[in-house]
Amino acid sequence: MTERTLVLIKPDGVQRQLVGEIIGRIERKGLTLVALELRHVSQDLAAQHYAEHEGKPFFASLLEFITSGPVVAAIVEGPRAIAAFRQLAGGTDPVEKAIPGTIRGDFGLETQFNLVHGSDSVESAKREIGLWFPDA
């Protein structure tokens, strides 16, 4: 089943010049980039994107990090795109859970600075794509 997912290359991935490597892995997996944009994230967009974490102790640091530098936002499409990208990304803890061969396993340094975000469900993908690409 063809799906769409939101992929973010977070500020640490942009700063470490891993954008080309990450996009290359997405394309080699057979997924298609249907929208791509480099942007600075506003506090408002960050708060909406991470709304499910509001009230948690790490919420403020999430917002601070995602707004700390440019982010590459992309809509990625393909068969089972959500699961396919999450497999490419690897576990959220790059040291303990992300295996070598995944983006986080190969390049991640710590849990908060884990390079990429990918939607975790069809519902999340629709909501997140609507936030980041309202005209899509």
UniProtKB/Swiss-Prot annotation:
<keyword id="KW-0418">Kinase</keyword>
<keyword id="KW-0597">Phosphoprotein</keyword>
<dbReference type="GO" id="GO:0005524">
    <property type="term" value="F:ATP binding"/>
</dbReference>
<dbReference type="InterPro" id="IPR023005">
    <property type="entry name" value="Nucleoside_diP_kinase_AS"/>
</dbReference>
<keyword id="KW-0963">Cytoplasm</keyword>
<keyword id="KW-0067">ATP-binding</keyword>
<dbReference type="GO" id="GO:0006241">
    <property type="term" value="P:CTP biosynthetic process"/>
</dbReference>
<dbReference type="GO" id="GO:0006228">
    <property type="term" value="P:UTP biosynthetic process"/>
</dbReference>
<dbReference type="Pfam" id="PF00334">
    <property type="entry name" value="NDK"/>
</dbReference>
<feature type="binding site">
    <location>
        <position position="104"/>
    </location>
    <ligand>
        <name>ATP</name>
    </ligand>
</feature>
<feature type="binding site">
    <location>
        <position position="86"/>
    </location>
    <ligand>
        <name>ATP</name>
    </ligand>
</feature>
<dbReference type="GO" id="GO:0046872">
    <property type="term" value="F:metal ion binding"/>
</dbReference>
<feature type="binding site">
    <location>
        <position position="10"/>
    </location>
    <ligand>
        <name>ATP</name>
    </ligand>
</feature>
<protein>
    <recommendedName>
        <fullName>Nucleoside diphosphate kinase</fullName>
        <ecNumber>2.7.4.6</ecNumber>
    </recommendedName>
</protein>
<dbReference type="GO" id="GO:0006183">
    <property type="term" value="P:GTP biosynthetic process"/>
</dbReference>
<feature type="binding site">
    <location>
        <position position="114"/>
    </location>
    <ligand>
        <name>ATP</name>
    </ligand>
</feature>
<dbReference type="GO" id="GO:0004550">
    <property type="term" value="F:nucleoside diphosphate kinase activity"/>
</dbReference>
<dbReference type="GO" id="GO:0005737">
    <property type="term" value="C:cytoplasm"/>
</dbReference>
<comment type="subunit">
    <text>Homotetramer.</text>
</comment>
<keyword id="KW-0547">Nucleotide-binding</keyword>
<keyword id="KW-0479">Metal-binding</keyword>
<dbReference type="InterPro" id="IPR034907">
    <property type="entry name" value="NDK-like_dom"/>
</dbReference>
<keyword id="KW-0546">Nucleotide metabolism</keyword>
<feature type="binding site">
    <location>
        <position position="58"/>
    </location>
    <ligand>
        <name>ATP</name>
    </ligand>
</feature>
<comment type="similarity">
    <text>Belongs to the NDK family.</text>
</comment>
<feature type="binding site">
    <location>
        <position position="92"/>
    </location>
    <ligand>
        <name>ATP</name>
    </ligand>
</feature>
<dbReference type="InterPro" id="IPR036850">
    <property type="entry name" value="NDK-like_dom_sf"/>
</dbReference>
<comment type="function">
    <text>Major role in the synthesis of nucleoside triphosphates other than ATP. The ATP gamma phosphate is transferred to the NDP beta phosphate via a ping-pong mechanism, using a phosphorylated active-site intermediate.</text>
</comment>
<dbReference type="InterPro" id="IPR001564">
    <property type="entry name" value="Nucleoside_diP_kinase"/>
</dbReference>
<keyword id="KW-0808">Transferase</keyword>
<feature type="active site" description="Pros-phosphohistidine intermediate">
    <location>
        <position position="117"/>
    </location>
</feature>
<keyword id="KW-0460">Magnesium</keyword>
